[in-house]
Amino acid sequence: MWISLKPILKYRGGKQREIPDFIDRVPRKYHRYFEPFLGGGAVYFYLEPEQAVVGDVNRKLITFYQQLRDQYPLMRRQLDELQRQYEENQTEYEALKAQYPDEHCENRNEALYYRIRAQYNHPTRELLEGVTYFFINKTAYSGMIRYNSSGEYNVPFGRYRHLNANAVTRAHSELLR
């Protein structure tokens, strides 16, 4: 029986659901694990290899994992603050919708999303790039990855009720070391 971490990110083509179909074919002992297409990391986090070489062509994805590995305390603080803001905004929005069910009510998470998306496209020092990547991954419409002709991420807000920043754990950070 394998004991495993869950993947942190939604990723198109992720293998989390397929793992039961092939895990019996994975050797239990090996010297080093190689993962050239890390993506959401479902297999990597499931196996929790002691020695691994991982990569991906998506620079922002790799930056997320590098910052998770190297700057976990700062990432954790920034994610906790975004989580707090998101929950506060959602509570306010749901209260407004309950009070005015037939009215259009502002969801401040939408403005928060577009502010973070702007930072994703034009990084500032306000947030780690990995934090903006995680936030976009969890709050964009259907978790889509799409860029316009200028190379800017342009997926709209997904209107999710929850942001689970607790998916990012110290155990994930330590495994990446």
Model feature map: region roles:
Residues 1-37, 42-43, 47:
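S-adenosyl-L-methionine
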